[in-house]
Design a protein with these regions (language model features):
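Conserved Rossmann-fold cofactor-binding substructure of NAD(P)-dependent oxidoreductases
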Residues: 45-64
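Amphipathic terminal alpha-helices
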Residues: 289, 294-304, 308-339
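Mid/C-terminal beta-alpha module of Rossmann-like enzyme folds, strongest
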Residues: 205-279, 296, 335-339
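N-terminal Rossmann NAD(P)H-binding glycine-rich loop of SDR-like oxidoreductase domains
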Residues: 3-23
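NAD(P)-cofactor binding segment of oxidoreductase domains
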Residues: 67-100
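Short-chain dehydrogenase/reductase
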Residues: 75, 123-134, 154-157, 161, ...
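Substrate-positioning beta->alpha
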Residues: 161-166, 182-204, 212-213
Length: 339
């Protein structure tokens, strides 16, 4: 199966290309906007393609059996990119789209959430863009295409700057720890390799023309945020684990966060690399307290995912993180951010 992977230079995209290359039934081609973001380390083929250029994308999709949309970035890249992809796939007669969405499409809802739960764009620009993107994929299906939408929770594992590297640095510097009621929300963590499993199973899932299905992705044994923070802190030797009150957390996020973010942008603009503390986005404070639990039973049943045990995932994260200098500068531009 000849498959184009859009966003192949990102965290999930790179891991997916490696997993696909190890199979005999799929021929993966990575799609990237720039030559610098190509994938020489994977040994796989790649092409240059602008996902916001309808004509170029339609040309690129000719002859492909499926396309996997792992594109991250700003709201336009997510929403408009999905609209362009839907039209390009129709024009190129590419029959199937595997679209990577997010649990953020469910908004601030709490409790057990299934794929039939209502979408709510109320969590900010990211949730709105992802809801819009899903609507564009649905339009592709209405025109006769086949689509599988995957809605992962927080994708982590070795190499995850967002949910491992950054969290580890906060723990080591005492800015994060046991958050009390502020960290009692379910983490909905899912190993990046399990997301890749789901994508490859979705490529082979029997579907008819004009059929759309969606799957939540979260490990059944994913813990509450407090448990994850304490487990990671102990494994890294960031002890004693501090109890962080809501006032301290909010001061860090709302007072220190904006100037830190501005400094990051300034350094990027002038092309300089400088180790700065990671700002804590306000959206994460909401997420850590949100009692949302993804029901991933349909993914287990229909995609046959063999979920990576939490302990195994944790060990691989610690092994990766322990080999890094916590003062290194880090590039978060290529990871999928759920807030």
């Amino acid at each position: 199966m000849k498959t184009l992977v859009l966003g192949a230079s990102g965290y999930i995209g790179q891991r997916l290309m490696e997993a696909m290359k190890a199979t005999s039934w799929v021929v993966p081609i990575g799609g990237s906007r720039s030559r610098a973001a190509a994938l020489p380390e994977t040994g796989s083929d790649s092409i240059l393609v602008d996902t916001l250029d309808a004509k170029a994308l339609a040309t690129a999709l000719e002859g492909f059996d499926a396309v996997v949309n792992c594109v991250a970035g700003d709201a336009r890249s997510i929403s408009e990119g999905a609209r362009v992809l839907a039209g390009a796939a129709i024009a190129a007669k590419c029959p199937r789209i595997i679209h990577l969405s997010t649990m953020s499409v469910y908004g601030p809802v709490e409790g057990l959430v299934t794929e039939s739960s209502s979408l709510d764009p109320g969590l900010g620009w990211y949730g709105r863009a992802k809801c819009d993107a899903e609507a564009h994929i649905a339009e592709f299906v209405r025109q006769g295409g086949q689509a599988i939408i995957l809605r992962p929770g927080c994708v982590f594992g070795p190499g995850s700057e967002l949910w491992v590297g950054r969290v580890g640095r906060w723990l080591r510097t005492g800015r994060l720890g046991d958050l009390g009621v502020g960290g009692d929300g379910w983490s909905n963590l899912v190993n990046v390799d399990d997301v890749c499993q789901a994508i490859m199973a979705a490529l082979q899932l029997p579907l008819s023309a004009g059929e759309l299905t969606a799957f939540n992705l979260a490990a059944p044994d994913s813990p509450r945020w407090n448990d994850y923070f304490v487990d990671l802190a102990i494994a890294l030797g960031a002890t004693p684990v501090k109890r962080i009150g809501s006032s301290q957390l909010r001061l860090d996020s709302f007072i220190a966060g904006p100037p830190l973010k501005a400094a990051q942008r300034a350094m990027k603009y002038i092309g300089r690399s400088l180790a700065l503390p990671d700002p804590i986005p306000p959206g994460l404070i909401r997420l850590w307290a949100q009692h949302i639990k993804l029901d991933a039973a349909p993914a287990s049943r229909n995609l046959g995912i063999q979920w990576t045990p939490y302990g195994v995932s944790m060990q691989s994260c610690v092994n990766w993180l322990s080999g890094k200098d916590a003062t290194d500068t880090h590039n978060l531009s290529k990871v999928i951010c759920t807030r």
